[in-house]
């Protein structure tokens, strides 16, 4: 829910689980038979089984690859839920002190929340610091706190602008390089075809990360937080960068130059394929998503860098990204850490699946800067080497802290944006309202808040 | 709407004539054989009763009493993200009744109920009166069609309506578009409650209709056959005689509907992802309690909210029963 | 019951207008019925139509009419094979949950309802009166504590976590008790006892056969309750192999909306929804006489 991601690809069939033939009795016996967990192999000499929660379907092959190349450790994959559903289950299991997996897939913005509830194992104690240089600097900072390592980065979401080259040609639009140009072109397009919009302003919770990414680009750094400095936290959700973004988009919305359909709707998907939207401002994982949602527009799309606030600038933002963390409930911290580090890690075989089928955007340096990824041509984008846009974007992303109450912050932001859309509050007061609510929440939760 | 609605029919069951007949003849032949129960028989009797009720008692203790007691204990503690938790007596409850999120949710479901409940039960009553009176094939189809949505999981029902409400390909918008009325944002702020009300009405009208119908079928025919002979029309018979006679059943369905409405949860939760700037986490009190616990890990405060909601429901339904005591006692 | 062929003769003149008005009334009533049928049927109609479409057609053709070429069988084939046939597995799970919970809940409710109606034992009144208060408790309030308690005995994330709480059906107990009181006279039981039947035999040979309509009703409604339950399994289960249909379909839908790219999944969610509700509708239609019997026995015309 908190981010719009995880492209799903061609129907990957699971052959191993021949569930079809499982008789009801068999299922019943297996399921009712015993307790829940795996990995209690204890004294016996078989391989250690590590239970992993992750939700994208292509993960099946990645696991198969891991299991093929490892003898002492085997991964058991479970799809516990997608996004927020998975986090909910993780939080409940942590509260109960039982039922969490060994390794769990978490988006970056969830890490501080789970870490604060003492759910994440410090992998630094099991050698994870050795991986520091293998990952993009800003990503490593998101998962670590000094020598404490709470997760291993997997993929990221550097933002860029995908656009319909054919529509741009038809309406004689120029590919905008600044947000001011973006607005001009938006007006031109909407005038030429009142049913078309330059893009869709994501107002829902799914797009909270999208809005945050745009603020990130505009220089907003709402939180100053590190687990080691508890209970201190800096909260500044109404800084200049954040305000700039809502002033800008509020203006576009009021002038009806962009649509305001929720991202998590079929209507939005349809808009991408029907030509209703001329651009899709998205992240490094976006191409996979777009190419399967808007299949029939294959070849018509291109990717350009994110428009800038100042001409010639190089400010970038990130939307979404995930990591593998080890929970404190694991009985095999060493092996679980190994799984988190090596499931993708720098494995070319795993990343080939990740890149070609799951459209993950690697944060692992050798893969990111390797020629296979950088030079890959995408038919959907008319043969464009789109990563030549995304990779520099990824390298231009600076440091960024998340809060340990990110769900609350995103929900509050979404509610306030909803009110502004409805005309109940002014766009210019959205940031201040969010700031008020979030700081008072944080104070009540025992943080020492500096504004 | 809520679990309780799924748990079964709320109708009293009139006795079967065949059973009575059997019982009558059986008993008649044996009347003389009656004897007073001896002490040992009474003990056996007591033991049998206990034995039979034990499985239920255990389940009741394990899945109702224990969780409730545990939740109550949780609600008396306060925990924060930083600083751990401590015993705080009724601090959470004090906070609940001044919490604008909770109160706005309560207000919303009350407003929702004031409109949706009369519409739904009105339709249910109308339907029940019709199928009580008309026996055509159409009436049979009518009865089953109205009842069918009850068999649809609430999740799937809300999902179907989510598609139907779509501004791009939903039939409602195709219609308004064709009529030149433009798009209607059925999932926007102004219409969301109506759209939710529509889903609930669609899902539960048939069920309530069947319950009321069962009550109508239990009425002695003679009463209104007589009225008809007196020249009363079908409409008059329905309104003046039938409706008052099933008033206790109406009160019952009304009460369960009110309870369900106060606990409103499933439909807003299923539509939430597609319209999250409208259906905020505090949209209904129950949704708020859910989000507090499952999203924000505020288990203690969430428990207090749930108990407060339970108290509101409890007091509300007893007040309601008290106010309608005369009416429900009519029968 | 009030057919046109009513005994006519001996009529006076003031009868004419009433016949007219009742004819008009019949037209009105029929019109009301047709309108309501259309409304209540519409989503089902949409579901059937949508299930025959592929993704493109689903999002680009009129929602309430078929589009050719249809892809109903493709959709079904995909539904049953997607991800190793997990849909079939969920269906099997649902059948197990509904079956065991339904039968179990009915048995428990029958014994308890019968005991409440026919026996006096310590704690009887207390237990029965708290039973009615039980339905006022919101399900969300019970979810977390039940989860925490079950996890203490390592039952979360097993089938039992769904089945055991579903066995508790206070309404069923209430229904059986009322039914027993109304339709099972003490004399009947007493007579059997005099004949030398033990309490168990009285229950199984005398009481149960009489209670059949009530039992079918309780069984059907508790099965439906479990079949349609979403919240409990959502909270209790972490393993997708144990999901029932409701949770599984929701996870597909969630995945389709959020991870996107899920072109295929929208058609799957729709076809899956159709297949998921069919068994219940068929059950209700076929068992109509029984469950309506449970509600209305004794007053059939």
Where are the regions a protein language model picked out?
Chain A
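A structural signal for short loop-to-beta-strand junctions that line the ligand-binding cleft
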Residues: 100-102, 131-167, 197, 313-317, ...
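Hinge/lid segment of periplasmic solute-binding proteins
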Residues: 108-159, 210-216, 302-304, 388, ...
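Short, low-complexity disordered leader/linker segments with a strong preference
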Residues: 1-50, 68, 128, 439-451
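Short, well-ordered beta-strand elements
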Residues: 44-57, 73-79, 102-103, 150, ...
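Extracytoplasmic/periplasmic solute-binding protein
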Residues: 148-154, 159, 183-234, 277
